[in-house]
Amino acid sequence: MSSSESVENECMCWAARDPSGLLSPHTITRRSVTTDDVSLTITHCGVCYADVIWSRNQHGDSKYPLVPGHEIAGIVTKVGPNVQRFKVGDHVGVGTYVNSCRECEYCNEGQEVNCAKGVFTFNGIDHDGSVTKGGYSSHIVVHERYCYKIPVDYPLESAAPLLCAGITVYAPMMRHNMNQPGKSLGVIGLGGLGHMAVKFGKAFGLSVTVFSTSISKKEEALNLLGAENFVISSDHDQMKALEKSLDFLVDTASGDHAFDPYMSLLKIAGTYVLVGFPSEIKISPANLNLGMRMLAGSVTGGTKITQQMLDFCAAHKIYPNIEVIPIQKINEALERVVKKDIKYRFVIDIKNSLK
């Protein structure tokens, strides 16, 4: 590597050094741009609960120093000679994965998120053996396949959360045909994912009911996000009154909860999609079978549907509700994420604060 390449590849970032999860300034080296790569200056990065999990080694597989961040938005500064879809100056996004085998049935169908050899954007092991570093950094180099075009008139700070929170609910909603005007949707939980499910539901022409254990969420659900109904899920009478009334349910709740009361809300042949991660699922087979209901899980989405979602949000002027912060506030922000003290997604202003 030449001295000029060395300077070009140097990357400022914030990293966790140990399971305390405390982040502080750090410097890493990004790879040089190869034939199919895109290098982008990161302007914004969303803050996801995954950043807490791996910064604090909650799954026991964190590799330090760890640079979080997989909701990345920025501007192209360099492209490899074979790159066809991007040019310098384009607005681009990078989501939860940055590589895959590109040969399996899932990759061939644009479902790279399901590839057995997929590589996470941070704390992953790339195919060259290196550990991936995420978007709490000044720039990143990614194969063009895993980059997304952000429409030029769509704010970069708004695009960032779409690349995890947005696609996590958009993908299953599209997969299970939850875009039928006039149908009814229930959204369980009103955080980063839940508020996007409400926004998509409204854009699809659905009648949306929000379920929460907190009455404090009522005003924002109805008046801020435009849901038609709000239900306290711990209120037996409210839940009973809605039995067999919903076509679809999207469960974004992160904590453990009973499933049967929600399953009873679905009409015959209704669909319940789980995108949260409770420690276990317990459900009555009769509730599932006799109602001919479907229970499905989902994660994020492949490259094809992620690009579709970005275009849809731009066309329909759908924007996540965000709080923009400087990177110097990230440790405080992560604590607030744990405490659910955010409406509804933090976005780091990398461009103006990472110096």
From Swiss-Prot:
SMART domains per the UniProt record, alphabetical: PKS_ER
Keyword Metal-binding: yes
EC code: 1.1.1.195
GO process terms (BP): lignin biosynthetic process
Residue numbers binding Zn(2+) 1: 48, 70-71, 164
Expression (tissue specificity): Expressed in the vasculature of the primary root and elongation regions. Expressed in the hypocotyl, cotyledon veins, vasculature of the first rosette leaves, hydathodes and at the base of the trichomes. In stems, expressed in the vascular cambium, interfascicular cambium developing xylem and cortex region. Expressed in the style, the vascular strands of the sepals pollen and anthers in flowers, in the abscission and stigmatic regions of siliques and seed funicule and testa.
One family name in Pfam for this protein: ADH_N
Keywords of the record: Lignin biosynthesis, Metal-binding, NADP, Oxidoreductase, Zinc
Name listed for the protein in its UniProt record: Probable cinnamyl alcohol dehydrogenase 1
Cited PROSITE patterns: ADH_ZINC
Residues reported to bind Zn(2+) 2: 101, 104, 107, 115
Pathway recorded for this protein: Aromatic compound metabolism; phenylpropanoid biosynthesis
The keyword Chloroplast is assigned to this record: no
One Gene Ontology term of the molecular function aspect: coniferyl-alcohol dehydrogenase activity
Recorded family membership: Belongs to the zinc-containing alcohol dehydrogenase family.
Cofactor details (free text): Binds 2 Zn(2+) ions per subunit.
Function statement: Involved in lignin biosynthesis. Catalyzes the final step specific for the production of lignin monomers. Catalyzes the NADPH-dependent reduction of coniferaldehyde, 5-hydroxyconiferaldehyde, sinapaldehyde, 4-coumaraldehyde and caffeyl aldehyde to their respective alcohols.
Reaction(s) catalysed by this chain's protein: (E)-cinnamyl alcohol + NADP(+) = (E)-cinnamaldehyde + NADPH + H(+); (E)-coniferol + NADP(+) = (E)-coniferaldehyde + NADPH + H(+); (E)-sinapyl alcohol + NADP(+) = (E)-sinapaldehyde + NADPH + H(+); (E)-4-coumaroyl alcohol + NADP(+) = (E)-4-coumaraldehyde + NADPH + H(+)
UniProt gene name: CAD1
Lineage: superkingdom: Eukaryota
Sites where the protein binds NADP(+): 168, 189-194, 212-217, 252, 276, 298-300
PANTHER family associated with the record: ALDEHYDE REDUCTASE (PTHR42683)
Any one Gene Ontology cellular component term annotated for this protein: cytosol
Cofactor dependence: Zn(2+)
